[in-house]
Amino acid sequence: MGITSDSVREIFKGLENGDGAAFFEHVADNVDWIVEGTHPLAGHYLSKKAFIEGTFAKLSQVLPNGAQLHVEDLLVKDNEAVVELHSLATAKNGLRFDNRYCWVVYFLDGVIVRVRAYLDSAMVARLFEENPIA
């Protein structure tokens, strides 16, 4: 049996509530996660640890209150979900980080094993240009 819209929404509540740890409990340690684009967060991550270090850890340095992700909509079929997310956060320099995402998420036994994430590359590039990190 595949996943349901309700189960996906429940998993993503962690991100919506600012509790990344709760969300990442549902992500496989060896997740295959591609963040598309040509910006500082883009890349092909082959583990949960690498993904967190390459994205969320960097974002936490420039977004004091986190990315503040919220699910706008989702489509579910079998073990796949397409999740539309919206981030409306404020950067250290006051920039409104108003970004939209589309994550294509693949599940195995209720655990996220693969993700393809699409987002506004120019917005991410601007965020890091105006808020450089070490």
Task: Identify what each model region corresponds to.
Residues I3, A57-A134:
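A beta-strand edge to alpha-helix "cap/lid" segment located at domain peripheries
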Residues I3, G18, L46:
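Residue-level signal for the nucleotide or nucleotide-sugar donor/cofactor binding architecture
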Residues G18-I34:
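Short, well-ordered alpha-helical segments enriched in acidic and aromatic residues
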Residues D29-K77:
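A solvent-exposed, acidic/Ser-Thr-rich amphipathic alpha-helical stretch
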